Amino acid sequence: MDPCDCSKTGKCNCGGSCTCTNCSCTSCKKSCCACCPSGCTKCASGCVCKGKTCDTTCCQ
């Protein structure tokens, strides 16, 4: 369950079950993606995705 770093390329795939674009999860089946909600510059690693973004409590 390695979080993927969207900040480097803006896109990433994570374990085949997460796809990030512009640091937002476009699809998630498990908590593997380090995706940032609106107004969040960085999310904690291991952040749990709910729907298409992580919870705002993940913000650092």
UniProtKB/Swiss-Prot annotation:
Lineage: Eukaryota, Metazoa, Chordata, Craniata, Vertebrata
Chain segments carrying region Alpha: 29-60
Residue positions binding a divalent metal cation 2: 6, 12, 14, 25
Keywords: Metal-binding, Metal-thiolate cluster
Binding annotation for a divalent metal cation 1: 4, 6, 20, 23
Similarity section: Belongs to the metallothionein superfamily. Type 1 family.
Single annotated GO MF: metal ion binding
Domains: entry comment: Class I metallothioneins contain 2 metal-binding domains: four divalent ions are chelated within cluster A of the alpha domain and are coordinated via cysteinyl thiolate bridges to 11 cysteine ligands. Cluster B, the corresponding region within the beta domain, can ligate three divalent ions to 9 cysteines.
Protein name per the record: Metallothionein
Residues involved in a divalent metal cation 3 binding: 14, 18, 23, 28
Function per UniProt: Metallothioneins have a high content of cysteine residues that bind various heavy metals.
Binding site for a divalent metal cation 4: 32-33, 43, 47
UniProt binding sites for a divalent metal cation 6: 36, 40, 43, 59
Positions bound to a divalent metal cation 5: 33, 35-36, 49
Binding positions for a divalent metal cation 7 per the UniProt entry: 49, 54, 58-59
Superkingdom of origin organism: Eukaryota
Name of one Pfam family that matches: Metallothio
Residues covered by region (Beta): 1-28
GO terms, biological process: angiogenesis; positive regulation of cell migration involved in sprouting angiogenesis; positive regulation of vascular endothelial growth factor production; response to cadmium ion; response to copper ion; response to methylmercury; response to zinc ion
